């Protein structure tokens, strides 16, 4: 019958702009047609009525269920309501829009911890960092371990000797090089600008913050091709790969035992110092 609830679907289409009041949403009608992607034409400009090839299909939608109407129309219209104000390109979510806008702003927030090169996308930074895993020009004369930087080789050689003579008087942490101590010391003096919004912990550089933030997100972008195990940071990923190759480059000069990680060697060498202290006291 002709009740007031039985109205044509066109009377209940949501008006443009009703999807939210976010500042990056722009009325599609204000975007020049030449700058829209295919499928972005206004509904008001779409051909009315059925096409000659397709039969007319009646769809009954209740006025009390507008969400059902929205779900019904979604497959018919490729909605991309987020528009770049610089070039007019459209996107279906704010994340893709923000990533695109870095092309215009030149922003590159993702920095390589090895060489300092910056990238606009996290995925590009991760792909770049894998290159450094293959670049190891500095070889230790005491073992088969090679390093990407001369500073890393120098620090490694201190591990062979079991020495970390440079100690921070504020927290007690020790380092094999004075330059490493100087870098560390600045973390006590300078404010840490990178603050985690999840737990409030602060960091002095974006690389350390990125590694920490993955503990909250669960992101583990480094995957071992041998066993499929994943890691959140590149250093643990590299150490894990040595287990597949059987590499144990860290050698104890006191007993000749080898280790795959420098931290394990340092822990082991403390047992020798404890034995020596016991003999001297007896």
UniProtKB/Swiss-Prot annotation:
Entry's localization field: Nucleus
GO molecular function: DNA-binding transcription factor activity; RNA polymerase II cis-regulatory region sequence-specific DNA binding; zinc ion binding
Listed SUPFAM superfamilies: beta-beta-alpha zinc fingers (SSF57667)
Organism: Bos taurus
Cross-link Glycyl lysine isopeptide (Lys-Gly) (interchain with G-Cter in SUMO2) placement: 80
Domain of life: Eukaryota
Basic and acidic residues compositional bias, start-end: 1-38
Keyword Secreted: no
Free-text function comment from the UniProt entry: May be involved in transcriptional regulation.
GO biological process annotation, one example: regulation of transcription by RNA polymerase II
Keywords: DNA-binding, Isopeptide bond, Metal-binding, Nucleus, Phosphoprotein, Repeat, Transcription, Transcription regulation, Ubl conjugation, Zinc, Zinc-finger
Matches recorded under Gene3D superfamilies: Classic Zinc Finger
Main location: nucleus
Region annotation (Disordered) ranges: 1-75
Higher taxonomy: Eukaryota, Metazoa, Chordata, Craniata, Vertebrata
Membrane-traversing stretches: none
InterPro entries: Znf_C2H2_sf (IPR036236), Znf_C2H2_type (IPR013087)
C2H2-type Zn finger ranges: 82-104, 110-132, 138-160, 166-188, 194-216, 222-244, 250-272
GO CC annotations, alphabetized: nucleus
Modified residues (Phosphoserine): 8, 44
Protein name (Swiss-Prot/TrEMBL): Zinc finger protein 691
Similarity comment: family membership: Belongs to the krueppel C2H2-type zinc-finger protein family.
């Amino acid at each position: 019958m002709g009740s007031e609830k039985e109205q044509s679907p066109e009377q209940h289409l949501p008006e443009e702009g009703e999807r939210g009041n976010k500042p990056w949403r722009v009325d599609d009608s204000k975007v020049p047609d030449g700058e829209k992607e295919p499928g972005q034409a206004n509904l008001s400009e779409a051909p009315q009525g059925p096409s000659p090839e397709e039969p007319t299909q009646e769809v009954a939608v209740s006025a009390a269920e507008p969400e059902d109407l929205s779900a019904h129309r979604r497959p018919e219209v490729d909605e991309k309501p987020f528009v770049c104000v610089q070039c007019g390109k459209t996107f279906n979510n704010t994340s893709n829009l923000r990533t695109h806008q870095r092309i215009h702003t030149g922003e590159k927030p993702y920095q390589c911890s090895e060489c300092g090169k910056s990238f606009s996308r996290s995925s590009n930074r991760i792909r770049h960092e894998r290159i450094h895993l293959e670049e190891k020009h500095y070889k230790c004369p005491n073992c088969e371990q090679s390093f990407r930087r001369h500073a890393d080789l120098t620090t490694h050689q201190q591990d062979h000797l079991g020495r970390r003579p440079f100690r921070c008087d504020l927290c007690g942490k020790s380092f094999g090089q004075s330059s490493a101590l100087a870098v560390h010391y600045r973390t006590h003096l300078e404010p840490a600008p990178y603050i985690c919004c999840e737990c409030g912990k602060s960091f002095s550089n974006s690389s350390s913050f990125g590694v920490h933030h993955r503990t909250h997100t669960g992101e583990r972008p480094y995957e071992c091709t041998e066993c499929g195990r994943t890691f959140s940071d590149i250093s643990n990923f590299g150490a894990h790969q040595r287990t597949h190759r059987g590499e144990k480059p860290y050698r104890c000069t006191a007993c000749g035992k080898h280790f795959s990680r420098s931290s394990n060697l340092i822990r082991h060498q403390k047992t020798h110092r404890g034995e020596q202290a016991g003999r001297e006291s007896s």
